[in-house]
Amino acid sequence: MKNIICFFTFFFLFGSLRSEAGQLIEYNLQGAMTQDDIIYILWIAGIDPQADYGVSIYDIKYETEGEGGYLDTLGGLVIFPHSLTEAFPILSYQHGTAVNDASAPSLTGLSLDNQEVLLISLITSPMGFITLFPDYEGFGDPEKFHPYITAESYSHAIVNMVRAVKELSYELQLDDPFQFNDQLHLLGYSEGGYATLAAQRGIELNYNDEFTITTSCPMAGPYDLGGTMVDYFLSIPSYPKPFYVPFVLTSHLWYYQGEDVDFSLYFKPFWADTLPSLFDGTHYGNEIDALMPENPLDILLPEALDDFTNNEDHFFRVSLGENTLLDWTPQSPTYFFHGMGDDIVPYENAQVTYDTFVANGAPNISLTLFSEELGGHAEVAPTCLSAGYNVILDYQAISPKGDLNSDGLITIEDVNALMESILIENDLTEFQWWAGDLDADNSHSIFDLLGVSDAVAN
């Protein structure tokens, strides 16, 4: 295994050194696969074996915004296709709920220990996507907690991983080159569905001058956390995956009140003592479920449950409300998918969110609900993921040299864009500089313009 550790620093005033959010800290080559390797694995898995490209697999570490304004180091996995002459869309895939740190994508890589990552990777990257798997804040790090279902943490993790992968492209240009274009796709299911919509919200509200989202496909996420999800838990006598509830509640307590928060103010004595160790990253969800009561709210003190039920200003009501994702209007193409038989995350989350966005004037939004006959949360996941991926394929553009506008074609529009670059030195993205530099001399010149013009003529 080839291990490469890179420390990238920037000089500021007075000669000081400083990192910044999105900076690539470390990268490690986990391996590579040929087209034949991928086709064989997909065939064994019973999946239609298609692979247009071989791929490389790297885990990375990068900086993101952390608590108190300090930087935090996160991990992730990136798989990219092999081509010296094409630029590919970035597809950020947000994984579903996991509790044990050993399940982080950067740690499992492409292995049977993480079949979600393995299958999504081998379906997407060999077909021309640079596929990213953010670990998420705190996940995979035994020294930290993962702030489960907190919107801002996902937004930061995903934005900064995209930045870091773009830096990785620069760092690998001699050893293992790959090139991104200007397309960015978001896709995720369950926790990943929530993370997808949270990242879309964060990008559109705070980073729209840096990123344009091509498509966003949130699936089966608890977007209406303070409404649909609260009503659901207060109305049901039991819940199939009870560990989800304390995972949210402990995460919100630690995230907003600090890791020294007094759990005995909220939970019955046994749970106040036990929950911190259950969510220390060494246990699996099924282990925690085996300890939980059928009704997960039974872990709360009676007075805390009563206050939560009747007081809109209760801490949990406020934190859940702050992380409800209905307070904006998506501008990017947004495609919701959910199963009507979902027994973990009710489909009303998607319905309420869709209705709210439509009422607010969202220009390009869709909701697909799948029949109860397709099963519950886990059973309907492959159907949702397949539908979302097919939407993304419809938008996908793989860009040859000369395709400055990322539409997968070389047209007169690309000629005009390159001419403007040469004549007036207008601002271009990193991809557009690559696309316009046909003779690879690190500049845009009349020779590049002639090359693009010839491509249009032919």
Annotate each language-model stretch with its function.
Residues I398-N458:
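Cellulosome-associated attachment modules in secreted, modular CAZymes
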Residues S19-E86:
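Catalytic-loop region of hydrolases
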Residues D343-N349:
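Conserved alpha/beta-hydrolase "acid-adjacent" motif
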Residues Y335-D342:
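Short beta-strand/loop motif that positions the catalytic acidic residue
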Residues M219-D327:
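Accessory cap/linker subdomain of secreted extracellular hydrolases
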Residues E67-G75, I79-P126:
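Short, surface-exposed "cap/lid" segments of acyl-processing enzymes
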Residues F80-A87, A164-L187, N206-F211:
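Gly/Ser-rich "nucleophile elbow"/oxyanion-hole loop immediately N-terminal to the catalytic nucleophile
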Residues Y148-L172:
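Alpha/beta-hydrolase active-site loop
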